[in-house]
Amino acid sequence: MSVTMRQMLEAGVHFGHQTRFWNPKMAPYIFGQRNKIHIVNLEHTLVMLREALDYARRLTANKGTILFVGTKRQARDIVMEEAIRCGAPYVNQRWLGGMLTNFKTIRQSIKRLQDMEKMVQDGTLNKLTKKEALDFQRELEKLNNSLGGIKEMKGLPDAMFVIDVGYQKGAIVEADKLGIPVVGVVDTNHSPAGVRYVVPGNDDSSQAIRLYARAMADAILEGRNQSVQEIIEMSKSDDEIMSGRDQSAGA
């Protein structure tokens, strides 16, 4: 998906926050104000979003993993849907402290979740008492809510895509500590500090959030497809080389 200026206008990407809540570090990306609301300069946003998507394409073409993060109410369902569509890990409920910096411990909880899911599939759950089964279901639901989106993630992600960097401050701090690049949607009331690829824009409108997340998911799918195509081309090239050798040997 190639994002256009018109699409951004229709999604309300240009609407920032009230001027009294602004963060001066976002000044370079602000076009002006209307009715005491800052207006984001979409010419900057378009260029910066495309740079972020190019980065995502290159990363996933090289088999990199991008973690989607968006736990605010407006973003939860959208983040989950788009991450699932492109096969990316995601966090759309509460960000658990240490999710990145203490991934070894988190991995143990993921293993517990996977073991519990196996118990459901193999019928072990049927052997539990009513109280045990109820406790089991509660724990399973809790683990699924917090870790379900990252249960297939084998290690730390190569990058992180974040909706609303202010709301996800803990995630940004952890990524920064570990040197994990962040692609982040930054509204006029937040600081772009710690964000490698800043996408200035509205982080409250569900239409705007859908536009960012869909564009990122498309870029990931394009990158993966590019990787597959390169493997196919390399395979064809190898076959041609081998075929040429066989013909030479037979001559």
UniProtKB/Swiss-Prot annotation:
PROSITE patterns from the UniProt entry: RIBOSOMAL_S2_1 (PS00962)
Domain of life, source organism: Bacteria
Gene Ontology MF annotations: structural constituent of ribosome
UniProtKB keywords: Ribonucleoprotein, Ribosomal protein
GO CC term (a single one): cytosolic small ribosomal subunit
Protein's GO biological process: translation
NCBIfam families: rpsB_bact
Protein name: Small ribosomal subunit protein uS2
Chain's gene name: rpsB
